[in-house]
Amino acid sequence: TNPYAFLLQVYFLNRRFAMIKKAMQEDNNILDRSIYEDSIFMKMNTDQGHATEEEWNIYKSLLDNMLEELPYAAKKKSPDLMIFVDVNLETMLYRVKKRGRPFEQVDEDPSLKEYYSTLIDYYADWKDNYKSSALVTIDGNHFDFAENKDHRNQVLDKIESAMVEVGTLSQSDFDRLRSKRYEGVQAF
């Protein structure tokens, strides 16, 4: 086992709990990571032998306790909408390389390729079992919303449409945002 795996995951869990409490004080906040998916990393660490079953059980107990406290710590218990960007291994490796963080690079540590592949599997399982709120899946293999404005607009349309469906965005606000976004863009 790795003596730091459990401590690091508890640290991240605590940070995510603080972030979600703050975000849930107001409407329409976006977090790039959520407390709801945090257990993926601890479970992976446990399955790969970096953390013990006892640490996994302590972690789960702590997470469950935090989730039970969330309604009292924030005005809502769960997000209105969860956005899941689904990518395959090839896309993930491309984006990791492009991001350029040395400690994430497969060229520096070839074992990371297996780690990323396993992470994708764990996320797929998590997505299939997520029930805390509405879930919108974005095809990250098709949409490069960071670099392509047309893709970004299509993704925003999908997210904002889902926000209308769950009642966090009015249809008139959706139409106004969409109109503003496509202002000056020629339709083909």
Feature roles, as predicted:
Residues F17, K21, D64-E68, A124-K127, ...:
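Generic structural signal for well-ordered alpha-helical scaffold segments
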Residues T1-L31, S39, N45, G49-A51:
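Conserved nucleotide-sensing/catalytic segment adjacent to the nucleotide-binding pocket
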Residues N29-L31, L81-I83, V136-I138:
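Hydrophobic/aromatic beta-strand patches that form the interior of the parallel beta-sheet core
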Residues K21-M24, Y72-K77, D128:
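Conserved catalytic network of the ASCE P-loop NTPase/AAA+ motor domain
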Residues K97-F188:
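NTP-dependent small-molecule kinase module
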Residues F41-D121:
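A glycine- and Lys/Arg-enriched "phosphate-lid" helix/loop adjacent to the NTP-binding pocket
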Residues Q25-N28, K77-P79, S133-A134:
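Short coil/turn segments at beta-strand junctions that form active-site/ligand-binding loops
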Residues I35-E37, V87-M92, H142-D144:
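Conserved nucleotide-binding/hydrolysis micro-motifs of P-loop NTPases
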